[in-house]
Swiss-Prot record:
Catalyzes the GTP-dependent ribosomal translocation step during translation elongation. During this step, the ribosome changes from the pre-translocational (PRE) to the post-translocational (POST) state as the newly formed A-site-bound peptidyl-tRNA and P-site-bound deacylated tRNA move to the P and E sites, respectively. Catalyzes the coordinated movement of the two tRNA molecules, the mRNA and conformational changes in the ribosome. Its main location: cytoplasm. It comes from Halorhodospira halophila (strain DSM 244 / SL1) (Ectothiorhodospira halophila (strain DSM 244 / SL1)). The gene is fusA. HAMAP family: EF_G_EF_2_B. Belongs to the TRAFAC class translation factor GTPase superfamily. Classic translation factor GTPase family. EF-G/EF-2 subfamily. This is Elongation factor G.
Length: 698
């Protein structure tokens, strides 16, 4: 089979946004106008095509990023058919991991902002992640029809808060109830959509007289931004004072692909305005798979770096970015093909697990409807049925050309709860179900508490764990009782010390002998653990050194102060001794763990607690109560800003004090304030808190 769509006509994009910016509605409209879905789904009726798990429909938020394929030829059918693969990403902070995962496999993104709410904390998180992966993006300021909508304020926030050079290529005509259409600054014309036709048809006219001056000024800015793309354009602009239509597009495209600028557009997806112009911009200004840097990977020797170009004639390489469980088909592995061709029935190798698996069926997803396909090629996004041992972030490659594409990094969970099955029959099912969910979602962990025998699940926030428990009930029919949330503390040290560890057992028969001297030192926050051997002259034989490291790691996992993992400690093994007969790996492991445990308690140990970034939006009259409440929770207020109809307060608050905050905020403000929080960093816990935690643990 030959390729249906040339790779330069592909666009792999994500639509990312804050929780209420209207992302799902925007995606819905894109599917409608591209002719895939014939009835528009509305999120607030719980009928949107993209939101396919029942919890999403009930809560009206998007949890799992589904991948959908659609085709677009332009508003005026001016382009050859372009294939757009859309990955829907969740906007809720607890699902940041899903966003990170999607951004990893995208080539470009559309960031949707609410014209009223503007840049919110989650927007900042998504922006940081998009910067990390170097994803070119376009901003779509949605909900221009809502009271309080203000396009220029949002553009200003993209500049100030997100630190990006925002370049409008459209201006709104009117706002709020009076939002009528947009001014296209490239064509210098006004575009109005036909309300009776659900926006399927539009008319293009002259710019209204009263907006001409604004449009001229904004166009000037846009042309200047385009001219900065390269010297040739700059010279042309300085000499002629203007650039041609094609030059402007070329300059804007080049700078968008280099992530130097963010083009800003506006509309109201709900009112069917501005979506087709957004689709045109996706084709004009976002990259094809062969216009982004080729992905890098490691060969089998784990040292040689190779690239895989986006072409069909390179060996097959793909990245699994999502595992989902489908009630009809079973396990679905969503993957992005970076190079080569794969047909159903082919074998693939998973270097991360060291296993070979055969691909059963290949499916192209349209939200929750699916079409079976025979093959996938470079640039495609599809789902495979029946892969058993693949987890999110694994590479799938040609068994005779092994390569490991970059692994994704996943954040550590900050909150944990104990879950207990209600009946004995739930017991077995619960273990299997939690295992399946952990395979789907790397930011969710399951472990068994050795002392109490309880099952502890941990994740990125209360909503994250609520949804996991909800899925246990719905998808796996497991009833469970859930304990109170617990904070995921960490332990570390404040000063450098030296410590000896000696394990000797020599009574008849083969004895045990391990003896080490280690230096322990605190590391920067977030630096993690490091182990270095400074052994000279073989006082500890080479083969025993990894065992000392192993012993230290074991203690770090168990914790010393209060049973929480130890972080940010550097260990140097600098001396020791051994016995020709009695020394063994086991003896040195125990000596290492003894030294670490004893040394830790002498190195000024402290407990660290997770601190959250909290942002509250409240009507002005409740501001005093809200700030007072945050202070009572050991919060430090960092910034207060005026926003339309109220105040925005940013604070840092320890997670321990935030349990039940939603209920208190509701009663303090009669339900008129809202808040979002996300993990920021670990801080030293005050002595009173630490003592309480340590006492509880002993």
């Amino acid at each position: 089979m030959a390729r249906k769509t040339p790779i330069e006509r592909y666009r792999n994009i994500g639509i990312a946004a804050h929780i209420d910016a209207g992302k799902t509605t925007t995606t819905e409209r894109i599917l409608f106008y591209t002719g895939v879905s014939h009835k528009m789904g509305e999120t607030h009726d719980g009928a949107a095509t993209m939101d396919w798990m029942s919890q999403e429909q009930e809560r009206g938020i998007t949890i799992t990023s589904a991948a959908t394929t659609c085709f677009w030829r332009g508003m005026d059918q001016q382009y050859p058919e372009t294939r757009i693969n859309i990955i829907d990403t969740p906007g809720h902070v607890d699902f940041t991991i899903e966003v990170e995962r999607s951004l990893r496999v995208l080539d470009g993104a559309v960031a949707v902002f609410c014209a009223v709410g503007g840049v919110e904390p989650q927007s900042e998180t998504v922006w940081r992640q998009a910067n990390k992966y170097g994803v070119p993006r376009i901003a779509f300021v949605n909900k221009m029809d809502r009271a309080g909508a203000d396009f220029s304020r949002v553009v200003g926030q993209i500049r100030d808060r997100l630190g990006s050079q925002a370049v409008p290529i459209q201006l709104p005509i009117g706002a709020e109830d009076n939002f009528q259409g947009v001014i296209d600054l490239l064509r210098m014309s006004a575009i109005y959509w036909d309300r009776d036709e659900q926006g399927m048809t539009y008319s293009e006219t002259e710019i209204p007289e009263e907006l001409k001056a604004d449009a001229e000024a904004a166009r000037e800015e846009m042309v200047e931004a385009a001219a900065e793309a390269d010297e040739e354009l700059m010279d042309k602009y300085l000499n002629e004072g203007e650039l041609s239509h094609d030059d402007i597009k070329r300059g804007l495209r080049q700078r968008t692909l280099n992530t130097e600028i963010v083009l800003c557009m506006c509309g109201s997806a709900f009112k069917n305005k501005g979506v087709q112009t957004l689709l045109d911009a996706v084709i004009e200004f976002l990259p094809a798979p062969n216009e982004v840097p080729a992905i890098e990977g490691l060969l089998d020797d784990e040292e040689t770096v190779v690239t895989r170009e986006s072409t069909d004639d390179q060996p097959f390489a793909a990245l699994a970015f999502k595992i989902a469980n489908d009630p009809y088909v079973g396990n679905l592995t969503f993957f992005r093909v970076y190079s080569g061709v794969l047909s159903s029935g082919d074998a693939v190798f998973n270097p991360v697990k060291g296993k070979k698996e055969r691909i059963g069926r290949l499916l192209q997803m349209h939200s929750n409807q699916r079409e079976e396909i025979k093959e996938v090629r470079a640039g495609d996004i599809a789902a495979a049925v029946g892969l058993k041992d693949v987890t999110t972030g694994d590479t799938l490659c040609d068994p005779s050309n092994k390569v490991t594409l970059e692994r994704m990094e996943f954040p550590e969970p900050v909150i944990a709860v104990a879950v207990e099955p209600k009946t004995r029959s739930d017991q077995e099912k619960m273990g299997q179900a939690l295992g399946r969910l952990a395979q789907e979602d790397p930011s969710f962990r399951v472990r068994t508490d050795e002392e109490s025998g309880q099952t502890i699940i941990s994740g990125m926030g209360e909503l994250h764990l609520d949804i996991i428990v909800d899925r246990l009930k719905r998808e796996f029919k497991v009833e469970a009782n859930v304990g109170a949330p617990q904070v995921a503390y960490r332990e570390t040290i404040r000063k450098q010390i030296e410590q000896e560890g000696k394990f000797v057992r020599q009574s008849g028969g083969r004895g045990q002998y391990g003896h080490v001297h280690i230096r322990m030192k605190p590391q920067e926050r977030g630096e993690g653990y490091s182990f270095e051997s400074k052994i000279v002259g073989g006082v500890v034989p080479k083969e025993y050194i990894p065992s000392v490291d192993h012993g230290c790691r074991e203690v770090m996992e168990e914790g010393v102060l209060a049973g929480y993992p130890v972080v940010d400690v550097g260990v140097e093994l600098y001396d020791g001794s051994y016995h020709d007969v009695d020394s063994s790996e086991m003896a040195f492991k125990i000596a290492g763990s003894m030294a670490f445990r004893e040394g830790f308690m002498k190195a000024d140990p402290v407990l660290l607690e997770p601190v959250m970034k909290v942002e509250v939006v409240t009507p002005e009259e409740y501001m005093g109560d809200v700030v007072g409440d945050l202070n009572r929770r050991r919060g430090t207020v960092q910034k207060m800003e005026d926003i339309p109809n109220g105040k925005q307060i940013r604070a840092q608050v320890p997670l321990k004090e935030m349990f039940g905050y939603a209920t208190d905020l509701r009663s303090n403000t009669q339900g008129r304030a809202s808040y979002v929080m996300e993990f920021e960093e670990y801080h030293e816990a005050p002595a009173s808190i630490a003592d309480e935690v340590i006492k509880k643990a002993s």
